[in-house]
Amino acid sequence: MGYTTWFEGGLTPNKPFKKEFINYINAFSEKWHEPRDVEIIKRSDPDWAKHCLDGNLGPYGMYYVGSFDEEIIDRSAAKGYTCPGYWCDWHINEKTGVVEWNDSEKFYDYIEWLKFLVDNFFEPAGYKLNGEIFWEGEERDDNGVIVVKDNCIYTYNGTTVYFNYDKENEKILANFSDRQLLDELIKRGIIS
């Protein structure tokens, strides 16, 4: 059991991502994140420098994307470990070059993970992200939008608006794009 949130939309970079950067971010999003013993990584993986970004393992090996063996986990380091959770489900779509959700279920701490990626990878590499990502969770009132402007992250929790259920209102809602709906909600003062 767990809680699932769905996402729609993406973040566009100020310049195209380098292929190596895409490969790294996508490998990072596929790995389980726990504190790792850097010295054991270096001893057990002769190619460890290829399995992190620019040869940097990061604090507690958090940037490492090589093979994940139980022996490299350092549970004693958990206090200083700063990854937001076990799974980061943001990735770079290789076809569009957009940062988006990878469709994995049960993505927790998604805003914190986005901030982690911006602070540790995108910003240091000179990438500025812009765009909107809408979210909707299993609970009726768990929805909103993440707006990113030049790597600054803003979130707007959604407001569930109930309409009388009739064909006219259904048609009006069906004609709104996500952007139009957001603009209309801002105009009406429902969100700011």
Predicted segments, located by residue:
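Short, extreme N-terminal segment that most often corresponds to the first beta-strand
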Residues: 1-34, 191-192
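Charged interaction segments
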Residues: 35-37, 46-187
